[in-house]
C-alpha cells in the first residue's frame, strides 16, 4: 500500500488488497516488491521495453539532433529501478562514468560492464545465490534491460556498437 506512488492500492480492513485501475499508472512497483508473488503486472516485459524505447524516442525528438550528450554514472547500481523509494546494497562495485553522444551505445556499454562485474555480497544478487557475473538484472529481477536497448536501436536512436576508451586519473 505504501509503495504505490499514485495511491492506487488500498486495504479494506479484514479484506483483500484493492487496486484502483483508474489511478494505477502501471509502474509495477507493487509487483516487484511483493514477496509473495501475489501481484502481477498485466503488461509483459516486451511491451514494457518497447514502450520505454518509444517514450525515449518521443522525448529525444524534442531536441535538436546532435545536441544531446548522455552521461551514465555506473555507481551505486541498485537492484530495482531508481524510481523505487528505497535503496539497497549495490549489486556490484562502482564501474565508473560513461559519456557518449549515442544513447544506445552508452546503454549497451553500461550493461556490458555490469555483465562482467561480480555481484557484491549482501546485495539482492547474493540473496538469490547469484555470485557470478552475467545477465545480472535478468537473473536478479527477471527483467532484461537489453530488450529496451534493442528496441531503441530498431527505432533508429543509435547503434549498439561502441568503443570504450578508458581515461586514467593523472598522477601528480
Which ranges hold each PLM region?
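Extended, low-polarity segments enriched in aliphatic/aromatic residues
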Residues: 2-172
Amino acid at each position: 500500500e505504501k509503495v504505490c506512488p499514485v495511491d492506487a492500492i488500498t486495504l479494506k480492513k479484514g479484506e483483500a488488497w484493492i487496486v484502483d485501475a483508474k489511478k494505477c499508472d502501471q509502474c509495477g512497483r507493487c509487483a516487484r516488491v511483493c514477496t509473495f508473488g501475489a501481484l502481477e503486472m498485466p503488461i509483459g516485459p516486451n511491451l514494457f521495453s518497447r514502450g520505454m524505447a518509444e517514450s525515449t524516442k518521443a522525448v529525444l525528438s524534442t531536441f535538436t539532433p546532435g545536441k544531446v550528450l548522455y552521461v551514465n554514472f555506473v555507481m551505486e547500481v541498485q537492484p530495482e529501478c531508481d524510481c523505487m523509494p528505497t535503496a539497497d546494497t549495490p549489486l556490484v562495485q562502482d564501474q565508473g562514468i560513461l559519456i557518449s553522444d549515442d544513447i544506445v551505445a552508452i546503454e549497451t556499454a553500461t550493461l556490458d560492464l555490469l555483465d562482467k562485474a561480480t555481484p557484491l555480497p549482501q546485495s539482492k544478487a547474493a540473496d538469490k545465490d547469484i555470485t557470478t557475473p552475467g545477465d545480472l538484472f535478468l537473473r536478479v529481477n527477471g527483467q532484461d534491460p537489453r530488450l529496451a536497448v534493442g528496441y531503441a536501436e530498431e527505432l533508429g536512436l543509435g547503434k549498439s556498437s561502441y568503443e570504450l576508451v578508458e581515461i586514467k586519473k593523472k598522477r601528480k
